Amino acid sequence: MNISDPLGDMLTRIRNAQMRGMSKTTSPASKLRARVLDVLTDEGYIRGYAEIEKSGHKTLEIELKYYEGQPVISEIKRVSKPGRRVYSSVSDIPLVRNGLGISILSTSQGVMSDNAARAKNVGGEVLCRVF
């Protein structure tokens, strides 16, 4: 199966698994996906993830997080897509729900949250937003 948007596929897998109340989900591994999951873990949106190798293929096993039976992530949405890339300078990085959520950016200094990008004074491609 050919996936045209691998990051969007992972975000959809997370969204679908949380709607079903699952504790874990899997996604094919890549460096970008792992860096996005690092940000989600650091910000407290998921419990963590592990890279597992099965029959020569690496997959990411993502542990989802719930609070009082409800998913911690109420919205996870792709912003920059393969057909329409969205870039933002440091002064134009969007606030998600007046600062209650985060944007995840791919910058020249790596993948990071919007708050980290503002602190390091760098802009970049807005990959997704999480609330």
Curated annotation (Swiss-Prot):
Q: Tell me where the signal peptide lies.
A: none
Keywords for this protein = Ribonucleoprotein, Ribosomal protein, RNA-binding, rRNA-binding
Q: Name one GO biological process term.
A: translation
Q: Looking at the Swiss-Prot or TrEMBL record, what is one Pfam family this protein matches?
A: Ribosomal_S8
Read off the SUPFAM superfamilies from this record: Ribosomal protein S8 (SSF56047)
Task: Please give one Gene Ontology molecular function term for this protein.
Answer: rRNA binding
A GO cellular component annotated for this chain's UniProt record is: ribosome
> Which PROSITE patterns does the UniProt entry name for this protein?
RIBOSOMAL_S8 (PS00053)
Keyword Cell inner membrane, does the record have it?
no
What is the top-level taxon of the source organism? Bacteria
Query: Which InterPro entries does the entry link to?
Result: Ribosomal_uS8, Ribosomal_uS8_CS, Ribosomal_uS8_sf
HAMAP family recorded for this chain?
A: Ribosomal_uS8_B
Record's NCBIfam families? PRK00136.1
Q: Which family does it belong to?
A: Belongs to the universal ribosomal protein uS8 family.
Q: What does this protein do?
A: One of the primary rRNA binding proteins, it binds directly to 16S rRNA central domain where it helps coordinate assembly of the platform of the 30S subunit.
Q: How does it assemble?
A: Part of the 30S ribosomal subunit. Contacts proteins S5 and S12.
Q: What is this protein called?
A: Small ribosomal subunit protein uS8
Species in which this protein is naturally found? Hyphomonas neptunium (strain ATCC 15444)
Q: What phylogenetic lineage does the species belong to?
A: Bacteria, Pseudomonadati, Pseudomonadota, Alphaproteobacteria, Hyphomonadales
Gene assigned in the entry: rpsH
